[in-house]
């Protein structure tokens, strides 16, 4: 099949959507398909390796300045149209999503969409708390309108599918968890020398244990809650250092918060890191933590498990079938006290036992299974379109 993937975020950006698309591109290509990606060009980024990555001129998005807004022009339109895709698979509800729909219409391609992001959790960036409920209703209505115009909708989890059904989406839906390259995160691939080098880079002192968070530093990721409980965690485990890998609009606020709480000496912000070496940052950790409730799947949880870390996460339906409390990770309730107790457990003997077996529970989320399921989804959609 000839497949076009369209997205408003892609490599070298580090987030779940970009990782999912990169994994899908690589695995489908390995399986003999011709796969092209169309996405915004990141500032300062030049790609000389891959002629199936089509980077489009872009500018920083007005609201989310760490994201890019693409401007697909006539040349890009010609390039995409002449490829005559069997499948157009959009991964965005905005600029590149519309561009993908336009290309699909031009070539009469089958149109698939993956709903990666629960947009009602992101309205704060526009409203800043003013009339936010009205904005959330608009986000729900827009998602319904958008998804009902596709041949098939792919949902990373049952949580997402249930949410879209509640919105009123009646297009055929399939639940297909995004896959990841499990092998590259395997603990045995990272030796002590590499681990020590990364820990030194992040200011980790000898004898300190690393509490790790990787991803976009944004309000919806709820890193504030982790920072709030950090002073009390340090009373129990004074050897902990909180390392935050990534970049985003909340970094300055969290830096100030760490100072005000008196924990700045135990917190490191690394800034953004390339996807090719992100596994090395997982490898230097001891416990991975997330308090986000806005995930559709949460690939970082699986990456952390594949890296042999104990994951401590605020419970969310996106984790159904991924983390079982006390077995493959530690799940907590939403309140601060519950998160604190979960982190104390994670740094105890229980956490060490969970970490020792974590990689086994990440194994089913590999890229091959993901690509096979997507391949079957495409074939089914093509067959139905011919009826």
Say what each PLM segment does:
Residues 293:
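Aromatic "clamp/platform" in nucleotide-sugar-dependent glycosyltransferases that forms part
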Residues 310-313:
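Short hydrophobic beta-strand element within catalytic cores of glycosyltransferases
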Residues 19, 209-235, 249-255:
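A conserved mid-protein helix/loop that constitutes part of the nucleotide-sugar donor-binding site
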Residues 41, 159, 179:
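Carbohydrate-associated surface elements
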Residues 324-336, 345-350:
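Conserved acidic donor-binding segment of nucleotide-sugar-dependent glycosyltransferases
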Residues 252-273:
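Nucleotide-activated donor-binding/catalytic signature segment of Leloir-type glycosyltransferases, i.e.
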Residues 1-45, 49-55, 375:
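N-terminal subdomain of nucleotide-sugar transferases
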Residues 147, 272-273, 280-285:
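Short alpha-helical donor nucleotide-sugar binding micro-motif in glycosyltransferases
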